[in-house]
Amino acid sequence: MIVRTVCRAKEKCLEKYKNILKYKEQLAKQDQKENETTSNNKDTSSSVPKPSNFRKTKVQNQYNRVFSIDEKVAEYEKILNDKVNMIDAIFNKAEKIRDLFIGTEPLTKELIKNELQYGAIVLNRASDLILAFADNNEPREPEFVLNTDMIVNDLKPLLHPTRIFDYSSFGFDDVNKLAINPKIRYLPNWSINYIRKCIQSFFTSNSNIEVQNLHNYSNHYDNRIYEHAMPNDVKLQILIGLDKMFNKLSIQHRFGTFETQILSCFFMKQKICEYEAYMHLPDCVNKSKKLKKGTETVCWQYLAEIIKHYEGIPFYHHTHSSKFGALDNTKISITTNKEVSCCLPSVMHGLLNGIIGELLCDLSTETALIYAKHLMNCSATSTYQRQLEFKDSFRMWPKLCYDSIGYALAVLYSKDMKPLEHRVEKIDSEFWFDEEEKDKLSSSLSKIPSYMKPFVNNAIQNCKKRGDYINQMICDINKIKLSREPNKFETHDLYLESGKNTEYLRWLTMTSTIISNFGIYNKTSLLLEYEKSISTKTKVMVQQPEPKVSLITEQGLQTPILHDWTKVPVLNEMSSLFDSEWKSTLVKEFEDINDFEKRFVTFLTNKSGGIKSEEPTLSKELKGISNARIIAFALNRNDYQIESKFLNMLIAHGKCAIRFQIDRRARVIVIVPNAIQSSELFLLLGFNVLKSDKRFNEKIAVGKQIGNLLDAKAQMISSGDVLSVKNSSDMKGMDAHTLPNLTLFLRRKMIEVLYELDPTGKCARYFFAEDKEYCLIQHHEKYHEQFVRRLRGPTIHAAKCLYYMFSMNMYLEDNFFSKGMNVSDQTFQSGFFATSAQHTLFLSLYLLNNERKYFSKLDNRMIRLLHSVMGDDVFEVIVNGVKYPNLVKEWLKLRNQGLSKINYEEDVSLSRLFGVFLQQAAILGVYVPYPARMSLFCDERSDTTKRHTLDMIKIVLEVLSSKSQRSYAIDNNISIGYAIWNCHRTSRYLYTDRDKSLIRRLVDHDANLDKLFVIDLSKFENSVRLVYPFVTIMTSPISWPMLYFAHFKIDDPNCTILTYRAKSPTSLNGDGAFLLINQMFFTSDEEHMFKFVEFVKHQDKVVRLKLSSDFLDWKERHTWGFTLGEHLLRFKRLRHLTESRKSELGLGEIEVMVHNLNKYLDSHRVQMSLDSFDQLRKNKITVPSSLMYVNHNRAKIEQSLTVRTETLDERASLDSTFLRHVFSYSIVPKDIEVLKTHALCAIKVRTYSDLKYALSVDGYLPESDDSSFNVILPFLPGYHQSSSYGRLFRYTTLPTVHDRDISGTMGEIVGGLGASFDIDSAIEFGAYVYNINRNLINAAASAIGIPQKFVSKYEQLVQAFIMNNFNLKYHSIFHNAKYFGLSGSLKKFSEYGGYSNKLIRFDTINKMEKFHNAFTRDLVFAYIDELNGRRVYLDYSIHSLLLIMSRGSIKYFTTHLYKLFNPLLSLELD
């Protein structure tokens, strides 16, 4: 069977190749004919083509003259034969490769050069060979094998899509060109073949578009179809739009192609099985004890049937014909005569995501089958749309499980999220708003699809049985208590079994989300989504307040400044509360602002501001980036000073854009022009003030997210209290429900604040509006009174902006069903600077007002309310709510009635056990992650596919690390990462005649380096195939966990094979890779580096040491590919791109913009920055240019140059630069800084298993307090004891609340300096300075422009950073996303590392402790699986110690040596 499949795959490859050659030949003849025609029509002097075209023609003619099609086909057949042999070799060693990727089989150089390389290149130029892998007949575990007939039946609707098109469901209105209430908003399960056939037939015959069996179709769908009434051109518009959507939106790769992604899955295998990953789940959950391969997953088996049906992937995503071809999102060719559904690519994405979910144990075999069946069910109509429609019904049923559980274990916390105790809680029932809610949910189970129903019913019954089981255990313990105290084993069993109940509820909650989320971005047309997303939804009207004071403009118009809120009862109470609680604070803060214009420029970023400038005087390059906000302002800043020009900018078009999301519908964004944003400044500044003030920020959650478990602090703490009610409500379409008067409410209140400012204050002018006497009108009930008052410019500016705010039209550019149109809507514009501020402050104010009214009644104070608000997301904890359900209902009734009066709708979700806020959920005090919300294979814009191979893999591995933190089997990400890397580590470089000398040099250079890099040079296509060393991702800075290595001992005549165990999945990023890798390559002739006795006897060796690199066997290190991999990763592509674009734009253009923008810098801070720069330079500290305050605007402009994706021409140029970078590679690094890093990391690792270095007194280290909680019930699903993370957690704690406090400080500083301020780089630089001299931290803050009032807070941020990170000469990086539930405190881990040499006086070495702590933590994280709770010992070399002692110099002096040695011990050497 497999032989026949390979032969068929080979035939398909050959057939496709011949078609490509014929197509190229036709193009060449066409070009030649056009050139001849051009030559005949022009005289000789003008007939010479442009050099690039001339070169292209010359190459093509030479290409066609030298090599015939037959020769190329013959050569290609040889290549295919070689690939068939590769496939045989891969199949023979497939299991060995999988075991290698999970660290149980040793990696050898032979495996790298043969089978691993075959896996990397087998599909190159032969993608149809994927059929051989899909149809392979390797043995599978019987328990994982599915019934093929069942799969084929499930796939039938997808593989046979409809040819009967329901045009009317798009709701196209031929008058206004909009889709009115469309029933189809996403790609449907229609045949793309037939869509294209219909389009073609229309253009060729100009006849009516054929619609088959309309009469029968109408009978199937009773109330539809008036096809006869729809104009033919509208049908054509719909079909062309769908074809464009299929081309541009259906494929959403993050990397590679479907073929290479599927091949990656072929090599994947679990490191821990379901039985280990589900160790805390009860036995009612099926747990396989077998390690599952990628080919044994449910979704692989579905995917394989699709591939077998079409004999490959039935479509081809074209690439641009450029170097390292990038995907072209304009054309997807169908390569089969069989029907292909528009939904097929989305289904394949969903199946690939399902494979990853099953390997990470997010899905078991049972739930993966439900997932696959649900995917097929949705795709029968529309993958995207049906998933969104089914979503709620698939996720509500776990509440019935909560209601049935009876007993569960809860974690109780202190206010700072320190776990205090485990408590077995009796849960009689869930909290229901009323009986109707429960009955409605119970009855909804009948509507769940048949493939889901048994699972749900069993889950509810299992919960009841588990509750009864715990109840019996409690009864047994109570009986024991009658005669004696229960022993610790009996009580421990109760906690353990109760913990399984909690774990079961968590698993069910996660499962309900995962099986209904395919991990794909729901992509659609802007036109189809417009009405659903942003068209205003109006159920009630909110009255317009009458003006109290108005400005009389020069044109005689009245512009309201102050309003009378008493006539608008629904807002009057909130207005009064604003005045009493917030107003005075805001007035005081605004009085201290020196210049609002400067603050506005601070908030301008390099993000798009809408339409690009069409100014004819601008260069092409500058026009290309003129839509960036900071650039746009720099170009037309003078127009802001002239009122007439500014008002023209106010009524300019905004632009609609669309963002795609996983598990949520597409979201239309209105890109608001800079001019309107200038008035948003005041609300944004006010918001920053209120969220930073502890008196007001109790409800405001913005700026407090730091990327670890503390982001769910409120949910973790409250869910452990089963007597409180958690309301995880959802505000339905808040943007669309925000009426104009609600949009204006807070902005009008901010004008009232500005009105109160002292007119003679520091900041009088704001662009065109200046400080002067203005003619105003006071509106009374029966008369108006004119008066004159001096006002600050910002007051006038804001008032005039609000007056024109809703006169702005929006430009809707769809590019699928229409080219573009202007639409006018009163909807809330989601692109405002202050969008988040608007919703957060409005809801906070609304809730505060309601609380005051509610608690004015004393009886209501039996409950207490805690709120967290961010944007349109609200989390509410009703303390004691379970005890007083009537008070809860009364409160919710008051709250919802108030919301309905202002046009808002809320979906209330109440629970005793569960809470979710900002997609962070918790149940009974443990975290409930949503792993499906992060997709490994899919990307919103597929931007990563356009990146260089090495940049791509960095991003992919970061996503994988973050995603797997939310899974049950975190450790299984190792195999996934290596499988993806191995199948995507090649690049094909197409070169021109101009590059031939470069390629020749590259090939010659590679030949001298054991042919590590170049694997194929094609004489037919002027192409070279490059392969990156397999071990590259193990090197710094990627530092993916090392595998199990085996190689011959250096300088050993007996050829002893040394093995090095695989390192833990918890390994840190950064320079720790140097420590780990070099353990294999220390040379025997440099043992004196580690044997200090020898060194003391022969101190003359210090002379040789200062230039020596002999401590490593560089030749051996090179042959593995480590040194080359490190060299390739040092290529700074972004820096080269920036320089290239700066060169294109011209230094003059940049300097003019910088000069214009620097006028808005604070002159005092500029001087302080320059003075501090000099101070730091005297201390041999260099401030990064981009961080200098005086360069902030320059940095923004340069960032604008790099925001847009590389063009194909730029990519070709950068790739040539990259290849030149390769030439600088040498086996022994020439860069002295690189050698210094190696020398600094010249430390031998000694573990307890190394008996020579184990101390007899070395016992087990004490476990952390938090670990006792985690062992019984893991805080995260994957932190169980079968996981490296669970083992690591035994010696650390949860993230500290101190980190959370710091996150608010970080938000405060960014709020003051603008969103584009690189706070992370600023903190890292501060940490670097702090580690050198903590007294210089103020100078560092001033140099980078931190205002004086934030300096102390900046120092707090720096100190928090150095608790978890180290960046002085050696970089040890702790990413919160990768260690979501762990503290990485360097001080905490310092106790796990010992010094192996007692001869050295480590206490005398400056900064030794800091370096030692960083080295220790890196080694503990890497070796956690083999330390077994004992210390790791560090055997420092002379190189390492002397580099730690020095400020970076490698000139070692004998005087340094006397500091190193313990004089008492030295006497023994004489």
UniProtKB/Swiss-Prot annotation:
Keywords: Hydrolase, Nucleotidyltransferase, RNA-directed RNA polymerase, Transferase, Viral RNA replication
EC number(s) stated in the UniProt entry for this protein: 2.7.7.48
Keyword Nucleotidyltransferase on entry: yes
Reaction catalyzed: RNA(n) + a ribonucleoside 5'-triphosphate = RNA(n+1) + diphosphate
UniProt cross-references to Pfam families, sorted A to Z: CPV_RdRP_pol_dom
Span list, region Disordered: 28-55
Stretches with biased composition (Polar residues): 37-50
GO molecular function term, any single one: RNA-directed RNA polymerase activity
Protein task: RNA-directed RNA polymerase that is involved in transcription and genome replication. Following infection, it catalyzes the synthesis of fully conservative plus strands. After core assembly, which consists in recruitment of one capped plus-strand for each genomic segments and polymerase complexes, the polymerase switches mode and catalyzes the synthesis of complementary minus-strands.
Protein name listed in UniProt: RNA-directed RNA polymerase VP1
